[in-house]
């Protein structure tokens, strides 16, 4: 079906937008992103956004947001979605799934009708903020009102906002069910029901809420599901609640082609030292570092700050205001490193991130796939480094098997062409998300287009002030000066194939014949052992 539509769209003159190019001359189009892209986003049928017959005002928003040509998932889904058919779409992380459903939603909505006409469900608050901003940016010339609502905010504010016309509601399932159940959000005439990260939304914790939400929609609704992975729960939901869905599967392989994956076998007590070595060796634009528990997130962020690197942290137990601020500031380059739990594995698009580090190795392939997908966004290059302990060796094998990929042992030197661009300052900053009001202090002074500070710059003191509201510092109260190169060097190996050579302070030399599960002794004052991962 999509191939037939593509041929028809390519040959047809669909709107006055294709006949008159004068309107494009006055657009405020951002500088072109000339970074190398992989076939994940370049393997298209040659369609243009103009071929979809979209409103000129929508095309203006698309081009002013920096979009040039549709990606494969956008080519497949947009024309089908515009026909009103249900869709099951599976595509890799970071290949343009959000625009694949936002564009047809914006095209379909009638701004003159003061009713909720599209509901977009996402699993996390950060993804809700990001998706709502994409809707606002692409539809800024359409006069469409977008509302984002999530848990962790007062219900009263949402009730007041719904007194005004709202056309698109983006949010997490629990909060939207509260609003619909109180007859505050009227979904009776909402024809579009969209789920992003559908595999997560159809997990045990969310499925009952999703089923209840569907009852508030009309029977002839259009249901669209988008995700990178489709477990059996998605098929069960589709069979029960979707009508002859059009299935799109662009997952010829599971991992992004632009991401290079490495592992290093490291004893638990040596992980911080290994991370310090990575910071000194890698050319990081921005990095996301994952831990398996909220307690370890805060402790590791504090340790990184003590080592002299700028670092934020984020996890689900933080206050919503602080989470919003972290998300906003990190996206806008205020800080170079972010330590987080799996809270930010879903859909978060920060194109400046070129390195992902699994400080704690994940337990399953699904989590691993979503974590490493935070780098290498939209066909660009990225690096994923996994710190593996002896207990993780079976998870490593299982994930390699399940994903059909091989995670290589980390070499002594990583080729910068695998993840570094010639002019990193030209990397486009993400679509700006307004900051939530807070007493952020000095952190507010960072300009939205400012790149991240040098990797060894001292952290922003203002960050600590506002993140203190979570009960703990995001770093030490007495910042240390950035460390220069040291003479002590270390090596760590992996599965008997190669090793990793690095630098660190207060560490004795590793055994040069180190292989696998043994490592050097911990002599540095900053190499305290992290707590157990189950904490």
From Swiss-Prot:
ATP binds at residues 91-98. Coiled coil: none annotated. One of its GO terms (biological process) is mRNA processing. It comes from Pyricularia oryzae (strain 70-15 / ATCC MYA-4617 / FGSC 8958). This is ATP-dependent RNA helicase DHH1. The gene is DHH1. The keyword Chaperone does not apply. One of its GO terms (molecular function) is RNA binding. A motif (DEAD box) lies at residues 196-199. It catalyses: ATP + H2O = ADP + phosphate + H(+).
């Amino acid at each position: 079906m999509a191939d037939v539509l593509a041929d028809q769209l390519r040959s047809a003159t669909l709107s006055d937008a294709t006949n008159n190019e004068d309107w494009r001359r006055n657009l405020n189009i951002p500088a072109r992103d000339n970074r190398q892209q992989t076939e994940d986003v370049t393997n298209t049928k040659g369609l243009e956004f103009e071929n979809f017959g979209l409103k000129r005002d929508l095309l203006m928003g698309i081009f002013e947001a920096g979009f040039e040509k549709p990606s494969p998932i956008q080519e497949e889904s947009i024309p089908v979605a515009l026909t009103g058919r249900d869709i099951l779409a599976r595509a890799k992380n970071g290949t343009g799934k959000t625009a694949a459903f936002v564009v047809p939603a914006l095209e379909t909505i009638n701004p003159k009708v003061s009713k909720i006409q599209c509901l977009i469900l996402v699993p996390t608050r950060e993804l809700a903020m990001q998706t709502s901003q994409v809707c606002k940016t692409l539809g800024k010339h359409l006069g469409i009102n977008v509302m984002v609502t999530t848990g962790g905010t007062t219900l009263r504010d949402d009730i007041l906002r719904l007194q005004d016309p709202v056309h698109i509601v983006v949010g997490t399932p629990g909060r939207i069910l509260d609003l619909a159940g109180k007859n505050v959000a009227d979904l009776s005439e909402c024809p579009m029901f969209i789920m992003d990260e559908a595999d997560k939304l159809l997990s045990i914790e969310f499925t009952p809420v999703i089923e209840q939400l569907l009852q508030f929609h009309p029977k002839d609704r259009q249901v669209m599901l988008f995700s990178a992975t489709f477990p059996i729960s998605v098929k069960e939901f589709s069979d029960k609640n979707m009508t002859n869905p059009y299935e799109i599967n662009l997952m010829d392989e599971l991992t992004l082609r632009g991401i290079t994956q490495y592992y290093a076998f490291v004893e638990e007590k040596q992980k911080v030292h290994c991370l310090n070595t990575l910071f000194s060796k890698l050319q990081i634009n921005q990095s996301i570092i994952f831990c398996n528990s909220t307690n370890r997130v805060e402790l590791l962020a504090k340790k990184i700050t003590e080592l002299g690197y700028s670092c934020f942290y984020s996890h689900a137990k933080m206050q919503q205001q602080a989470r919003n601020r972290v998300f906003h500031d990190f996206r806008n380059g205020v800080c170079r490193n972010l330590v987080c739990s799996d809270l930010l594995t879903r859909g978060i698009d920060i194109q400046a991130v070129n390195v992902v580090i699994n400080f704690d190795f994940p337990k399953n392939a699904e989590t691993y796939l979503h974590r490493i997908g935070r780098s290498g966004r939209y066909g660009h290059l990225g690096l994923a480094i996994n710190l593996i302990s002896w207990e993780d060796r079976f998870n490593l094998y299982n994930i390699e098997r399940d994903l059909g990929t091989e995670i290589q042992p980390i070499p002594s030197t990583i080729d910068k062409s695998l993840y570094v661009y010639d002019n990193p300052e030209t990397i486009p900053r993400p679509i700006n998300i307004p900051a939530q009001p807070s007493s952020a202090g000095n952190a507010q002074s960072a300009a939205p287009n400012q790149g991240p500070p040098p990797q060894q710059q001292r952290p922003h003191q203002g960050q600590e002030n506002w993140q203190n509201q979570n009960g703990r510092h995001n770093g030490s109260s007495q910042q240390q000066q950035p460390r220069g190169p040291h003479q002590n060097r270390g090596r760590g190996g992996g599965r008997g194939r190669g090793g990793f050579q690095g630098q660190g302070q207060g560490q004795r030399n590793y055994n040069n014949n180190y292989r696998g599960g043994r490592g050097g002794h911990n002599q540095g004052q900053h190499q305290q052992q992290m707590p157990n991962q189950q904490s």
